[in-house]
Regions:
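N-terminal presequence-like segments and the immediate start of the first folded domain
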Residues: 1-62, 66-79, 86-144
Length: 144
């Protein structure tokens, strides 16, 4: 039977009443739940300084990195991202955040970006779920 381990990161504490896991390591594959910039985005909105899609995407990608590192991995292990946005017009801002996050990597993960009618809280503009394999590195990706 393939080993399964729940991954936790100090930068992304599990909610006490959550009915999900932020990340599971199944063998060498890390599967991450959809991540948002909550609660930081809500706190910023309450101060009258709402975070734009670029800022939210950077927070979320930082959470993805924290979970990867907690599992013993790195950004080069990411092979698939699903990006959900509430405004398709934000796709360029999300793209900029991705360029910054994957700077120097060469090969980007496969990705889907779709517009959705809403996320769990109204101030959220971006949600990302991710898959990684600890036994691959996209920095060493061959071209077909």
């Amino acid at each position: 039977m393939t080993a399964v381990r729940r991954i936790r990161a100090a930068a992304l504490p599990d909610l006490p009443d959550a009915s999900w896991s932020n990340a599971l390591l199944v063998g060498e594959e890390l599967v991450m739940s959809g991540m948002t910039a909550h609660p930081a985005t809500r706190q910023a909105a309450e101060r009258g300084a709402a975070r734009d899609a670029h800022a939210q995407a950077r927070v979320v990608l930082g959470q993805v990195k924290a979970l990867l590192e907690a599992a013993g991995g790195h950004v080069g292990n990411l092979y698939k991202l699903n990006v959900y946005v509430t405004r398709i017009a934000d796709k360029d801002a999300i793209g900029r955040a991705r360029q910054e996050f994957f700077a120097g990597q060469g090969t980007f993960p496969a990705s889907t970006l779709v517009e959705v009618s809403g996320l769990v809280f109204p101030e959220l503009l971006v949600e990302i779920d991710a898959w990684a394999r600890l036994d691959i590195d996209l920095a060493n990706c061959d071209e077909a």
